[in-house]
Amino acid sequence: MILGIDEAGRGCLAGSLFVAGVACNDQTALELLKMGLKDSKKLSLKKRFFLEDKIKTHGKVKFFVVKKSANEIDNLGLGACLKLAIQEILENNRSLANEIKIDGNTAFGLNKRYPNIQTIIKGDETIAQIAMASVLAKAFKDREMLELHALFKEYGWDKNCGYGTKQHIEAITKLGATPFHRHSFTLKNCILNPKLLEVEQRLI
């Protein structure tokens, strides 16, 4: 059985970071692939929520989602929050899988304690369990930002999901940051260095 891990909200200026872990066998993963499972960034919002429901209600799928708030990211740092979230998933699910696959190029040093960890760049495009984790994390992030958009409509969170789009940056410059913005280096840097917008927009 494979445990796949992925995140959503890493490059955002607002809202939480969500890290998800999904464990299932290859046969179950194939069932989800036949339903249209792929990297969450290539799915519509409606399709992500549809697959989220299928993953969460499937009897042979085990999942775990960890949320790290904007406040935690400001206080601890993004890297520390990612490591803590992945560690929490591993501590709760390591007995479920003999293989652990994380999207990206770093295991944040956790491979010393969990030697069966494998990091895979663009793993959400090649490993079904990582794609499933990607869908869950992104669906949780989508839902959070839609709820926050109802409170702060000027920032366009229903469209940009907290990323640093032109509209979002302009709203921050004009209205200031909300309690749900990350008041750390990322936020300040994006306002002072507009060139970073291109990088942030690619992450949407």
Swiss-Prot record:
It comes from the Bacteria. Disulfide bonds: none annotated. Manganese or magnesium. Binds 1 divalent metal ion per monomer in the absence of substrate. May bind a second metal ion after substrate binding. Keywords: Cytoplasm, Endonuclease, Hydrolase, Manganese, Metal-binding, Nuclease. GO terms for cellular component: cytoplasm; ribonuclease H2 complex. Its EC number is 3.1.26.4. Residues 1-197 form the RNase H type-2 domain. It is found in: Cytoplasm. Transmembrane segments: none annotated. SUPFAM superfamilies: Ribonuclease H-like (SSF53098). PROSITE patterns: RNASE_H_2 (PS51975). GO terms for molecular function: manganese ion binding; RNA binding; RNA-DNA hybrid ribonuclease activity. Its cofactor is Mn(2+); Mg(2+). GO terms for biological process: DNA replication, removal of RNA primer; mismatch repair. A divalent metal cation binds at residues 6-7, 103. The keyword Metal-binding applies. Belongs to the RNase HII family. Endonuclease that specifically degrades the RNA of RNA-DNA hybrids. This is Ribonuclease HII.
